[in-house]
Amino acid sequence: RISGGISSRKSKRKSGGEAELVSGPFPVRGGSFKIWEGGPMDAYLLLENGAEFHGCFIGPERELISEIVFNTSMSGYLELVTDPSYTGQAVVLSYPLIGNYGVCREDMESERPLLSALLVRELSELESNWHSEGNLRDFLIRYDIPGISGLDTRAVIKQLREHGTMNGLISGRHYEGEEREALLRRIRDYRVRDAVRRAGRKEISEFPPSG
C-alpha cells in the first residue's frame, strides 16, 4: 500500500530493540544487523520520493537502503536473482507469482546472488518441479538476501516508470515525523559502491569445452 495503508498487525521481534540502519545493502555478517524471530513480520518499502508500500518479510528480516529497479520477466526468476548485473540493487518483479517451480543450481547465472533484495507480489510456499532442489525462501535465507512479499508491485513499478530508478529503504518499521525526513535525505544520498569488485571474479576459472 502507498503511505497511509499500514497494517495493524503487530510485528514480532527479538528482544533487544530494532535493527540498526546500515549504510548500504552489504552489511558485515554477524555485526551490523539483527534477525527478528517470529513471522511473517511486517515489512515496508519507503521510496526516496516518500511513497511507502507494505508487505511481509521473506528471507532475512533486516533494514537496508538500496537502489530499486524492476524486471518484467514472466519466468526465470532464479537466473534473475543470480544475475551479477543486479549487484547492489533491490529488484521488483512484475509477474505476480514467484517461486512456484523452486530453485535449481543449474539455473544459476553466478555462484551466488549479489542483488540486495527481492520484492514480489506473492511468494509461492510450494514448488512443483521435478528439477527443483529447494524453495526460493530457503534460497534467500541461505544467501542472506532479504525480500518482501505482499507488495503492490504494480504500484511500485508505476512509481519507478514515472520517476525513474529510485533509492529506497527496506525496513520492519514505519517511520514518521523528523525521523522519516532524515531517513529520506539519507535514502536520496545513497549510491551503489564497489559493484564491479563485488561481482567480479577473485581468481581465474577455466571452463573446459565439452561436446
For every predicted segment, state its role.
Residues 41-211:
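RNA-binding accessory domains that recognize and position tRNA/RNA substrates
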